[in-house]
Amino acid sequence: MNYQPRGISTLQGPASYQSEIEAAQALLKTQPTWNGVTAEAVARMRLQNRFRTGLDIARYTAALMRADMAAYDNDPTKYTQSLGCWHGFIAQQKLISIKKHFGGRTDRKYLYLSGWMIAALRSEFGPLPDQSMHEKTSVPALIEELYTFLRQADARELNDIFRSLDKARKEGDTAREKELIAKIDAFQTHVVPIIADIDAGFGNAEATYLLAKKMIEAGACALQIENQVSDEKQCGHQDGKVTVPHEVFIAKIRACRHAFLELGVEDGIIVTRTDSLGAGLTQQIAVSHQPGDIGDQYNSFLDCEEITAENAKNGDVIINRNGKLMRPKRLPSNLYQFRPGTGEDRCVLDSITSLQNGADLLWIETEKPHIEQIAKMVDRIRKVIPNAKLAYNNSPSFNWTINFRQQVYDAWKEAGKDVSKYSRAELMKPEYDDTPLAAEADERIRTFQADSAKRAGIFHHLITLPTYHTAALSTDNLAREYFGEQGMLGYVKNVQRQEIRQGIACAKHQNMAGSDIGDDHKEYFAGEAALKAGGAHNTMNQFG
């Protein structure tokens, strides 16, 4: 599919500023009682709101993401990235910053919606662990909020251009006027694809379908679903994870696909996450109809002991494995245990099965960021599915510093290099920060995404909860300075002055909140009688 954002009055894609004014003029001529409504105001407001619904956003961003996936298949240097956002304002500022620092472009830069952050920050129950205990409706609500703020970023940036255009016309600067109209015509939206975490579906396949619909209607083009038991779900980096048989998970994949197709988002993307590497338990024994089928393969990983009819106990669950009676190890929790050391094999089987049943991207949850560990599994998957590719969690749950310093330490030691100056267990200590080992580790961290995109098939690199940590860090720094000896200078020097020096748009916070947009709307609606907020006495004038 190929979906483009709407122009002002057409469904056929973006149109020029002038043609949209002309379209509005033609409409207004048919309505003689619409006094005081100007064609240019209508054109501007429509341009500022080029996505009318969440489904418009989902279709547009799905097409972008599909194009990015095809580009990556041809060139693995063209991987994509995202940062997890827990509030619309955070997403808005992220995209404004991206456009500022990267030539006005947002190419291959996405949003990520983390179930962990919704649980920790957005539940009405207060902070919760990542165990699917938060309200399921909070997920589509946050998606809608993220895109509301991104659409407002479009409106704000275009409004500033419109004001500059009016100024150029007033001054008779035709060259500047032409330049600004071209800028309007070439405007790139802040709206980008989102990969949204649906956890394990919050229930059965029907519950998954219903929630998927709400998420897509809110704007999600990509849904990430995991193979854990919904009511026993754990964070991917915690213990106690329990997986479900493949037929259960496949039903939820199909539920997501049906939701996309029902809503006309044919390009919708499904990301299937396997937690099998760290999950040693299953709630169910899979149904198997014949030897070697998917249920039999799942059950082959169960930790069993051979028994006979004579030593079987009352209440035992017994399976037939290659003609032998086997008793799976069952815990007091009524969960069944997998054989130790089978995690990678189960991840490979999970991934192949998901791709063969409608998944578009894989997600293998690992316990550490190690390229070769990921690559070895992907190599096995690609023997069956040659274009298999991953989304990968560059997780804050990893201690990146100690992991990579230990990787370098181990590599140096294996190569016969002298590591006597280093204590492997203490490499996190600050005294190692300026050492050659730390420098090499930092370089490996810097190139991790590019290296793993090339070696391990990672199409999308995300950080799940970076803005959770940046909020905590920046608040800690401000509290230390402001409530300490620095007083007000702690804010002025380290926040406001830095915003101004770095050109952070929020330095003019009234403008960011929509005050100028509101003033211009007042003028559209009331003409010269409009009472505006942005007059000579507005303190925002101090910021230029």
Language model feature labels by segment:
Residues S474, L478-N494:
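Long, continuous compositionally biased terminal/linker segments
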Residues M1-N2:
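Non-Sec secretion/translocation targeting segments of pathogen effectors
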Residues L11-A456, L462, A526-G544:
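Alpha/beta enzyme core
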Residues T401, H469-T470:
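A SIS-like phosphosugar-recognition module
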Residues E372, A472-L473:
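Extracytoplasmic/secreted cell-surface and envelope-processing proteins
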Residues K493-G544:
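C-terminal functional modules
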